[in-house]
């Protein structure tokens, strides 16, 4: 199954996340199909960018979003 979730990039104690489309069987930081945005929780205000067109496309194809990505997409 295809899922839309966060993958962590960034250094120790300085998280930065990429919003990616991946297979649900892959590890959190494993390979991904497409990167559709990013999330920086350390900046003030929190920096969120998600490509709405690509998000809608992947949801239309049947990809499921993680809970965190659903919350972030409402804020973006």
Curated annotation (Swiss-Prot):
<dbReference type="GO" id="GO:0003735">
    <property type="term" value="F:structural constituent of ribosome"/>
</dbReference>
<protein>
    <recommendedName>
        <fullName>Small ribosomal subunit protein bS16</fullName>
    </recommendedName>
</protein>
<dbReference type="GO" id="GO:0015935">
    <property type="term" value="C:small ribosomal subunit"/>
</dbReference>
<keyword id="KW-0687">Ribonucleoprotein</keyword>
<dbReference type="InterPro" id="IPR000307">
    <property type="entry name" value="Ribosomal_bS16"/>
</dbReference>
<dbReference type="GO" id="GO:0005737">
    <property type="term" value="C:cytoplasm"/>
</dbReference>
<comment type="similarity">
    <text>Belongs to the bacterial ribosomal protein bS16 family.</text>
</comment>
<dbReference type="GO" id="GO:0006412">
    <property type="term" value="P:translation"/>
</dbReference>
<dbReference type="InterPro" id="IPR023803">
    <property type="entry name" value="Ribosomal_bS16_dom_sf"/>
</dbReference>
<dbReference type="InterPro" id="IPR020592">
    <property type="entry name" value="Ribosomal_bS16_CS"/>
</dbReference>
<dbReference type="Pfam" id="PF00886">
    <property type="entry name" value="Ribosomal_S16"/>
</dbReference>
<keyword id="KW-0689">Ribosomal protein</keyword>
């Amino acid at each position: 199954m295809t899922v839309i979730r966060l993958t962590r990039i960034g250094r120790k104690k300085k998280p930065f996340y990429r919003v990616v489309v991946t297979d649900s069987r892959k590890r959190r930081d494993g390979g991904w199909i497409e990167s559709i945005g990013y999330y920086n929780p350390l900046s003030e205000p929190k920096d969120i960018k998600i490509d709405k067109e690509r998000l809608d496309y992947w949801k239309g194809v049947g990809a499921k979003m993680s809970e965190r990505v659903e919350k972030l997409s409402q804020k973006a």
